[in-house]
């Protein structure tokens, strides 16, 4: 550990914390809250040695304050046993942009509503194009919790740790190893919830359902065993499986049965999955019309109800998961609770709110769009209008323009944060997670986990995200 870097970072917190051996002691929480923004900025934009020290101080200070990355596994299994209520749906939010300010807005909304059952997540594809490795993402979330005075378990999830069908076909071993490397990096960073997505390998051309799902359940089982080997002591990582690729045909009871029977048969003696993602009619990012607006999407809520009941009653899971939901109309969200959906994934709408926000200079938006035309023109379909092309690809500009957004004027970030908080509050109320801090405290016992020294900063190779879901 660099003593010089340590002193530089400690100087930023003005005596609020002290390093005692391998631990961080919080001496003055108020001063820490006042200065944590400077620490996370260094944790994101400093040189590698500075990043490592800043992230370590954030992690250790969070542990000391009782802000602990945790697995939601036990709560979901309690739902499967009928011991936990089914009258709320857990939102899982992908914070592609302004992760720290966005997470602050989440924690403010949660504190206001006494909510505890919510998840921060990021997908394999997003890690690449938003330029946020797992350790950075965890640090931003924990720094936000410190800033907003939040306490308790914090659920951070790897979303769509997904096999690319194209890469798998070319070189299966290489693709499997890439996912395992990402899993290990994520667990080390504090991701104690991981959604495995090998549904891309389902082959519906096969006449037999077991054959259709075989590669999916075999690889999901292999990754589950790997996760169980790598999870820290005292943590049972919540693992999710997926039976229907988002944007493809709707899932059926027969699909679920084929997957679960096969998965349980081959997984071995390890703890299995806690939930299953299914397809019900959505597309990630929505369906973009020629003018760049979104088409109304019809979700088959009956599929969620039927398959969720089957997953709980026959297999003891927490239920089923809905992906690609953030671009649905506001009137749809309460229906997830009515059909007892376990978890719903939300991403694109928050990105849209930030990019389109009136506090963001038009010149910055146009700079992003010009960058897209110069750098991702190959992704434009011949039938795409310019508005469609920009809407569908602008997420690819998030990483290259990350610093420009983080360094917007304070009043701009405040205005964006306030509007995000309103949206999170609305979603949390619709999904009925108000008051869920109590049920989380009942079922989730998160251990203190310390890092003896800063983790090495992984740059992570830029990988092609073609064909990967968000």
Model-based region annotation:
Residues 321-324, 329-330, 334-348:
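Structured mid-domain segments that build the active-site/substrate or prosthetic-cofactor binding neighborhood
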Residues 167, 288-290, 329-339, 354-365:
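Histidine/acidic-residue-rich catalytic or RNA/ligand-binding cores of hydrolases
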Residues 197-203, 339-358:
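Glycine-rich phosphate-binding active-site loops on the catalytic face of alpha/beta enzymes
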Residues 159, 239, 276, 323, ...:
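Conserved, mostly hydrophobic/aromatic
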Residues 1-158, 164-167, 171-175, 181, ...:
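Alpha/beta catalytic barrel-like cores
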Residues 104-117, 135-139, 143-151, 170-316:
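Alpha/beta enzyme core
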Residues 160-161, 243, 319-328:
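Glycine-rich beta-to-alpha transition loops that act as phosphate-gripper elements at the mouths
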Residues 280-284, 326-329, 350-353:
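Short, catalytically relevant binding-site loops at active-site mouths
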